């Protein structure tokens, strides 16, 4: 099969010099080779074993990868490969390169969650509040018909600057970043752009801005709006998630700048609803409308056990991150502030995203749980936690 495919594709490609066709050929050939049982190379196995040794020899490393990548797991998985050719090194390389990682692993494709489950399952159970290997993600419940219960958390505007709810989605039929070809990126971008162009709902309708060839004027405006995402940080770079940048990447936003979609950043799609103030119900209602509009035309990858599939296992399940930018000057100065948030199942970040610090006394606080609960429950976890923090701040 391999030789026949190679000969036919070579003859086809010989008729032209299309870079995209050659890229598609390269990816197809790689997949055929993987399916025909080609083993993981000795060089890759050596790098896997070196990575394991590096983690074990690093006392400053406290990642979940280090905790669950035992010698037994290495020996069990080091020679395994998904149908798309991804191996254990693809899973662990970011955590090996960045010893300060919290999680340290990424899934190069959907099959990785099954093939490398001796590593993923205990790690997922640890991160996602005891989500056991035999547990199943509940059916999707975005909160339709329930959003009116989420009244404004801060009607006087004393604490909350803005509210944001996002979810990630992966398109069916495509792997995750490390296994995507340039042709894949461009094809996905073309598909979702066509969907964006057909949105007629006045609350959602807007414009798509591709990163490739973006003018300085548009770039400056998107930076001013805090919409522009940059090429991946060192964690994503090390995971091989930024290939062919900026091909196939872009940003859609509605005319009111309250609904935003990132195309091929960390996940295939990041769907975001946001606005100033603390009206969580309004933000969620808009997100529901947006997700429903997109999924009618683009099927998403969902697993019966793990829910909506994403590149990073921290986002599995609902993929929902509901957050506020909030000022809590009194209680945030207390040494047990993080412990209080942990007890409320809340996660603290700086306002510039993951791995950033607080700025000007403003914190980005969100639900921590993504897996093992419904989408609405994830939002409600943030809502109830923030209400409690505001009450503590008022009483301090």
From Swiss-Prot:
InterPro entries: ATP-guanido_PTrfase, ATP-guanido_PTrfase_AS, ATP-guanido_PTrfase_cat, ATP-guanido_PTrfase_N, ATP-guanido_PTrfase_N_sf, Gln_synth/guanido_kin_cat_dom
Domain Phosphagen kinase C-terminal: 159-396
Coiled coil: none
One cellular component (GO) term of this entry: extracellular space
A single MF term (Gene Ontology): ATP binding
Sequence positions that bind ATP: 162-166, 226, 270, 321-325, 349-354, 364
Protein name, as recorded: Probable arginine kinase F46H5.3
